[in-house]
């Protein structure tokens, strides 16, 4: 009797969490069409810049863009200089103790903005015009972070976009060789 109640409560919890079993296979054709549309949108977004975009600094991709992580993390050494991905104007410099740490927001042409977070030092001020040659600051360990990296967010007209769709290729974090003997 106790086991029966456990099963019933489990089904209720699973149903409330939104899980509904299905026998359908994923719509492959629809997925391919959606992926192709995303590719075309990325090409259009990248073409809206007059100059090519650059990476803020050398490094490795340590965390990808997702619904829960609206940017990418580029792992690198502590103190690495951070450059804007393209020319723009500094619209915000701030410190968020729990989340982004020290961060800078740069407004670019055509409704784009880029945010650079977890900075150790910030070298720019709000209202300052910057080019990709200028230094925004240095990579640090401020805010909620587990190691030195830049959290880079890009928005277009207020909507988050995956930076990997318009930036040059960022190499994946190398796998650590296991010590086997």
Segments from the language model and where they lie:
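Short hydrophobic beta/alpha edge segments that flank linear recognition/processing sites
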Residues: 74, 102-106, 130-145
């Amino acid at each position: 009797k106790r086991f029966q109640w456990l099963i019933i409560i489990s089904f209720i919890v699973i149903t409330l969490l939104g899980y509904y079993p299905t026998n359908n296979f994923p719509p492959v054709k629809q997925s391919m069409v959606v992926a192709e549309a995303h590719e075309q949108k990325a090409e259009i977004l990248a073409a809206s810049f007059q100059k090519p975009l650059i990476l803020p600094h050398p490094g490795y991709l340590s965390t990808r863009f997702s619904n829960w992580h609206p940017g990418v993390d580029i792992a690198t050494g502590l103190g690495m200089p951070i450059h804007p991905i393209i020319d723009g104007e500094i619209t915000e410099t701030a410190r968020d103790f729990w989340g982004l740490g020290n961060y800078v927001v740069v407004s670019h042409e055509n409704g784009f903005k880029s945010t650079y977070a977890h900075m150790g030092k910030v070298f720019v001020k709000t209202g300052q015009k910057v080019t990709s040659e200028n230094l925004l600051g240095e990579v640090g360990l401020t805010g909620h972070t587990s190691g030195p990296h830049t959290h880079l967010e890009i928005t277009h007209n207020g909507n988050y976009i995956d930076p990997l769709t318009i930036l040059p290729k960022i190499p994946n974090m190398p796998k650590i060789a296991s010590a086997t003997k």
